């Protein structure tokens, strides 16, 4: 497998069918079970149930055993289209299915799938028969709670997660990846490296510790340097903005449920979930000419979104975060060159973080059925994105009809060291937000008439917090030298050499490196072990010989030790940092 997150339709179908087999097994083992929904998801599937009694992970082997028993029947998956009346009668004892049926449009086809003794309301597709499901190619993973339809006012259901693969060896490979992913979990490593913590009483908000904040600022300053080189102007917009702005932008109608809302002086305000309306407001200040375009406004924008507590995950999914956000205001003629420029910037930045071109996937989302603008405009916009990818040497897969209603977009996904995929960067064309119907941004064209600019929404990293989580897991906490919050620790072999260790620290500090002299009372071996656990890449051991020769014994993270003069180590580390070297050796 090229990546463990298999996207093929065939594998998704297999997983969906395995979910049905699991549902049949659960119904067999727990009579009276009410079944809800059971889709295929990334890496596997799940099914939600209302069970007659609580179950836990100890029950999973029995369910797996029943599933394998069902598979021996080699039953076919048979589709049948039925009337609404028949569906309501068939599922009269299944309240969740009845609710789904009643919620379907009057003209929508209602289909069921039969397999063995189990019948489910389902659109499909499915494999032909249970013989297509390898009895050793699936595993039930865990049990969790899930509110019906994600609504905390509705019943809490039991969700059983599983994974399914075409071959047992694929399953084995996936489970090995999960084991390695557990070791690389950013929450575990973040704690070991003393980077951050999250308070149980304040979920979704990060407390950055000194080392973690150093890492954060290193990334932020790197991005700031790159975008300045690329002609962006950095701005800052208010964290709290009035309801009237969100209504005009369209976010109030489409995004209100995800916004934190407050009231002051009988007016409603919202903590911003995104930065785009604020950037349009900046563009609108003063008269703009076509000569001012393209105008590139960038912001490390603090955003807050009211994410359900159950969806929060470390620093990967949080409520308060900062985006490396930017919006480019340009003419239609400038779209292609601006997107090309952005793609080149994105490739360079990803490479510096250790993601080469073959670790970048690009999805090109084209016009949806419901959209604004005429076909000629969409033709030009889509061609501009396609040409930009070609200019940057980026191959893409087309996602037909998945563009936003206001314009097509490119989405950039990174493949990490375990083959997992993380969607990070994006660039979207927007004809709607600057329009007269929304925020009415205008410039004076070369014809002396007013025009609305095209707006390009773009980000490279996305959420800085989430990207840091991705980096931690990608490199197992062992950051490249330029990123490491602590680039070197000086460890004296005995207290007699503390003064020399502090001298080395001062010299390295003056050169701009992030170093610590560990002159604590622990024994040398304990110090070395501690800094190894904290993922420090260079430990500089100093004793009598090093002090006499103005040198350091450089203990490499991957093993081995090399004596260098202090000047040699400075040159060595400077070269690693300046070249954005990924390998510390």
From Swiss-Prot:
InterPro entries: aa-tRNA-synt_IIb, aa-tRNA-synth_II, aa-tRNA-synth_II/BPL/LPL, Anticodon-bd, Anticodon-bd_dom_sf, Thr-tRNA-ligase_IIa, Thr/Ala-tRNA-synth_IIc_edit, ThrRS_anticodon. Its main location: cytoplasm. One of its GO terms (cellular component) is cytoplasm. Pfam families: HGTP_anticodon (PF03129), tRNA-synt_2b (PF00587), tRNA_SAD (PF07973). Keywords: Aminoacyl-tRNA synthetase, ATP-binding, Cytoplasm, Ligase, Metal-binding, Nucleotide-binding, Protein biosynthesis, RNA-binding, tRNA-binding, Zinc. Zn(2+) binds at residues 276, 327, 457. GO terms for biological process: threonyl-tRNA aminoacylation. Its cofactor is Zn(2+). Residues 185-480 are annotated as: Catalytic. It is found in: Cytoplasm. Its EC number is 6.1.1.3. Binds 1 zinc ion per subunit. It catalyses: tRNA(Thr) + L-threonine + ATP = L-threonyl-tRNA(Thr) + AMP + diphosphate + H(+). Homodimer. Catalyzes the attachment of threonine to tRNA(Thr) in a two-step reaction: L-threonine is first activated by ATP to form Thr-AMP and then transferred to the acceptor end of tRNA(Thr). Also edits incorrectly charged L-seryl-tRNA(Thr). Belongs to the class-II aminoacyl-tRNA synthetase family. This is Threonine--tRNA ligase.
């Amino acid at each position: 497998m090229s990546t463990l997150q298999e996207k093929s339709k065939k594998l998704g179908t297999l997983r969906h069918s395995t979910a049905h087999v699991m549902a049949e097994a659960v119904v067999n083992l727990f009579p009276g079970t009410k079944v809800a929904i059971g889709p295929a998801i990334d890496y596997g599937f799940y099914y939600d149930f209302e069970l007659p009694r609580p179950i836990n992970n100890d029950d999973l082997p029995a369910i797996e055993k029943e599933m394998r028993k069902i598979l021996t029947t080699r039953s076919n998956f048979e589709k049948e289209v039925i009337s609404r009346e028949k569906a309501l009668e068939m599922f009269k004892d299944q309240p969740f299915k009845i609710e789904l049926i009643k919620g379907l449009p009057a003209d929508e086809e209602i289909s069921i799938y039969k397999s063995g003794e189990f019948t489910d309301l389902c659109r499909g597709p499915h494999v032909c028969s249970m013989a297509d499901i390898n009895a050793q190619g699936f595993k039930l993973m865990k049990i969790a709670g899930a509110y019906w339809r994600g609504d905390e006012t509705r019943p809490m259901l039991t969700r059983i997660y599983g994974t399914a693969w075409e071959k047992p060896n694929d399953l084995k490979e996936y489970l090995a990846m999960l084991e390695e992913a557990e070791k690389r979990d950013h929450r575990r490593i973040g704690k070991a490296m003393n980077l951050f913590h999250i308070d149980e009483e304040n979920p979704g908000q990060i407390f950055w510790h000194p080392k973690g904040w150093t890492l954060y600022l290193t990334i932020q300053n790197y991005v700031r340097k790159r975008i300045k080189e690329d002609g962006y102007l950095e701005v800052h917009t208010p964290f709290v903005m009035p309801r009237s702005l969100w209504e005009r932008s369209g976010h109030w109608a489409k995004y209100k449920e995800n916004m934190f809302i407050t009231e002051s002086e009988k007016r409603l305000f919202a903590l911003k979930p995104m930065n785009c309306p604020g950037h349009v407001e900046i563009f609108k200040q003063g008269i703009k000419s076509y000569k001012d375009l393209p105008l590139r406004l960038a912001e490390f924008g603090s955003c807050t979104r009211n994410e359900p507590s159950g969806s929060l995950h470390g620093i990967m999914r949080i409520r308060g975060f900062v985006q490396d956000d930017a919006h480019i205001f340009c003419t239609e003629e400038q779209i292609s060159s601006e997107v090309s420029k952005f793609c080149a910037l994105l490739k360079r930045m990803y490479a510096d973080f250790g993601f080469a071109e073959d670790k970048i996937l690009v999805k090109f989302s084209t016009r949806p059925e419901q959209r604004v603008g005429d076909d000629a405009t969409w033709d030009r916009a889509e061609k501009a994105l396609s040409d930009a990818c070609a200019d940057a040497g980026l191959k893409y897969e087309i996602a037909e009809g998945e563009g936003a209603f206001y314009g097509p977009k490119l989405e950039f996904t990174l493949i990490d060291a375990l083959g997992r995929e993380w969607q990070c960067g994006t660039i979207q064309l927007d004809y709607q937000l600057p329009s007269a119907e929304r925020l009415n941004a205008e410039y004076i064209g070369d014809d002396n008439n007013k025009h609305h600019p095209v707006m390009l929404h773009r980000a490279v990293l996305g959420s800085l917090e989430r990207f840091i989580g991705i980096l931690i897991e990608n490199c197992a906490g062992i950051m490249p030298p330029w990123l490491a919050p602590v680039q070197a620790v000086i460890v004296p072999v005995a207290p007699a050499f503390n003064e020399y260790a502090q001298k080395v620290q001062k010299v390295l500090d003056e050169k701009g490196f992030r170093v610590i002299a560990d002159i604590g009372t622990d024994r040398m071996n304990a110090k070395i072990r501690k800094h190894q656990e904290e993922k420090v890449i260079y430990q500089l051991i100093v004793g009598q010989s090093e002090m006499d020769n103005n040198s350091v014994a450089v203990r490499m993270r991957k093993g081995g030790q090399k004596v260098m003069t202090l000047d040699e180590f400075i040159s060595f580390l400077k070269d690693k940092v300046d070249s954005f070297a990924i390998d510390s050796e």
